[in-house]
Amino acid sequence: MTNSQTGSPSGLPIYEVFAVRYATREALRKNHFIGGDPHDGPMPMDYFVWVVRNAQHTFVVDTGFGAEVAAKRGRTLLRTPAEGLAAIGVDVAQVKDVIITHLHYDHVGTFESFPIAQF
């Protein structure tokens, strides 16, 4: 039997989780590790922001980086994080809750795009 408000057997809310890819980087393994890597070879890297949502709440996890940082760091910006979020129906101007996992440039670079968010 499920809880009538949550739909889950445990009574906990159910959320959808989306990974939104906004940038990429072509690189070698040695570019990712201090001191290099003796097994050097291609090791591309993708960059994501995340959305965790249900009918009552939307949380954005990390805010990514923008065009200026992408150019300075040699990353390929596929779309801004805000554009990626808009593609799944999330308006950054309306997001109230943002979770920052840590303070690296690729996790917190466009925080100003979330004017009413609580971090």
Regions found by a protein language model. Give the residues of each.
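Conserved beta-strand hairpin/beta-sheet module of binuclear metal-dependent hydrolase folds
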Residues: 22-87
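Short amphipathic alpha-helical surface micro-motifs
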Residues: 1-3, 31-34, 42, 100-103
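Extreme N-terminal starter segment of soluble prokaryotic enzymes
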Residues: 13-16
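C-terminal regulatory/interaction regions
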Residues: 2-11
